[in-house]
């Protein structure tokens, strides 16, 4: 039986590829997709969700737009990474259907209410929508199996010295998620920087030769350009968000540990830092399954296999 999931995302090149992977996987039943502000402004990320689902011929999946800004600060976007549209590079179709006439929180709450079984939330952007859901619908917490997020890091940041982008955009929301009591699975930079896509992998995807694999290759062409900056020391481009979906499909290719994680919401130098109690110093019970490593070759193979689904 397929695992029911909802995806809250801010497309974004890697969010788009996470959607491609999820919708090529019969092991998963995507019940809804909601858009968060983050990589681009909320109207652009919502449009990008609709464009991707149009490309993938999935107008049956309900879509809704979310919060326009983080809980307690102005919105920060990553247009230097993802371009003016949020999905610069390929030529994507215009949306062929409209979003639901409700908010992301209302859509997620409706799906949880109607589901006969618990639902996994996958959040690949800032955690604003998820935090608002948790705050406004405590009666639905028991219907959430787990929250799988892309965000944070045990070590270095990628937007501030100590903070990863998604957590930095809305640290208060992320802290609410980690301390919610709902199991969290964290794909942070520790693992996503090991999930690099190399130029040869992009050509492999391109050679699959269907319209979706071609667009994924073109998305990665654009995404690769930003990551060529010498400061990163990368051979390729880290494919952050698809790690969440890949973990649901093949957890055995990931190395994980169980630890307590909190988010620094106020630090002068560390706002947005995910504080990982690696040595169990706080006495707090672990609240997070933390991904630390991935079999990169198996990860790329999984992507290639699922891209062939769109033939």
Curated annotation (Swiss-Prot):
Name of one Pfam family that matches: IU_nuc_hydro
Catalytic residues (positions): 240
Q: Which GO biological process entries does UniProt record here?
A: nucleobase-containing small molecule interconversion; purine nucleoside catabolic process; pyrimidine nucleobase metabolic process
Instruction: Cite the GO molecular-function annotations of the record.
Output: purine nucleosidase activity; uridine nucleosidase activity
The cross-references to PANTHER family, in alphabetical order and at most eight, read:
INOSINE-URIDINE PREFERRING NUCLEOSIDE HYDROLASE, URIDINE NUCLEOSIDASE
Q: Name one GO cellular component term.
A: cytosol
Arranged from A to Z, the UniProt key words for this protein are: Glycosidase, Hydrolase
EC identifiers of the protein: 3.2.-.-
Q: Does the keyword Hydrolase apply?
A: yes
Q: Which family does it belong to?
A: Belongs to the IUNH family. RihA subfamily.
Gene giving rise to this polypeptide:
rihA
Instruction: Provide the protein name.
Output: Pyrimidine-specific ribonucleoside hydrolase RihA
| Function summary | Hydrolyzes cytidine or uridine to ribose and cytosine or uracil, respectively.
The species this protein belongs to is Klebsiella pneumoniae subsp. pneumoniae (strain ATCC 700721 / MGH 78578)
- Please give the CDD domains that the UniProt record associates with this protein: nuc_hydro_IU_UC_XIUA
